[in-house]
Amino acid sequence: MYDKNQVTRCYDLAAEAYANRFFNELEGKPFDHNILTWFSRLIPGHEKVIETGCGPGEIARFLKDQGVNISGIDISQNMIKVAKRLNPDIDFSQGDMLNLKLENDSIFGIVAFYAIVHFTLPEVKLALQEFKRALKPGGYILFSFHIGSGVLPVKDFLEQKNADADFVLFQVEDIVKVIDELDLDRQEVITRYPYINREYESKRAYILLKKK
């Protein structure tokens, strides 16, 4: 089960190390670069997008530079401080993706790159249900996750003492089943192999959904 306090503490402790490690990682990930560019072209210029689990804001930064009207939330206050420092022109705030402070049918796009990695499958369903609630009809969700099975307990994440958290791997078919139960329109389900020596060596999935 998702331990909100543990995850918050982990990223509060690891915020600076995380930014140092990952803020510029898109430069070495052409697939991610391309899929985010593709997503940005689905968003009309006046519509708003929110990134959940934004970390230091590397995904929001990329989308902002593509002309997307984006903001970001993260459960970690320290991560939000880092994101604001690195991206002073983007609105970031502390928030919970399981309880978005958004009205029903109020936003056109939601991005969640590896933001579900601490959830169990039932909690993934809750997150997607919350995304659907906030999304305008015709709006999009783009999210990604590590493919596999089981839970990986991590101690001292990024060598930061007491930054502990459980990372969860998912099978694509299990996530797809959840999506279909929520009656979200699957636009694309794409997988890729890891970039060797550049990232954690798991296969990854990227899913684009549309609210009917």
What are the functions of these language-model segments?
Residues 184-195:
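Conserved S-adenosyl-L-methionine
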Residues 50-52, 56-99:
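Class I SAM-dependent methyltransferase SAM/SAH-binding core
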Residues 125-137:
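A short glycine-rich, Lys/Arg-flanked "PGG" loop and its adjoining helix->strand segment in the class I
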Residues 98-110:
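A short acidic, Gly/Pro-enriched loop at the edge of an enzyme's catalytic core
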Residues 1-44, 142-166:
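Conserved class I S-adenosyl-L-methionine
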Residues 167-182:
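Short alpha-helix
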Residues 195-212:
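Core SAM-dependent methyltransferase catalytic element
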